[in-house]
Amino acid sequence: MYNLFEDEDDIFQGSPKSKFLDIVYNANRDLVHNELERLMTRMAAMELMLEEIHGEDKVERVIQSVQFDRADEVDMMAKNLYIISVGNVLTQNE
């Protein structure tokens, strides 16, 4: 990929993941708790949808297959989700 989010000359320095971790470790605990709760609830809903479509015993295999076959897309989506989560915490912190 183009490393769109990891420009070394970026004034914010760091990847979306590193910024997310900075926020998790340093922001208001309640705000971080709320965001992590939101993420877990979404992940649980997605797992349930996958179970309904593919069956409970195949969920892990389907996830691994997508991670392997669409690695670039998964990486980009993960970076976008880090950015969204950072934004959610920071906007609540104002």
Feature roles, as predicted:
Residues 2-5, 61:
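Long, charge-dense, low-complexity tracts
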Residues 5-9, 74:
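Intrinsic disorder/low-complexity signal
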Residues 9-61:
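Long, leucine- and charge-enriched amphipathic alpha-helices
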Residues 24, 49, 74-77, 86:
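Enrichment for repetitive, rod-forming helical segments
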Residues 62-77:
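Short, mixed-charge aromatic SLiMs
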Residues 79-94:
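Long, charge-rich low-complexity segments
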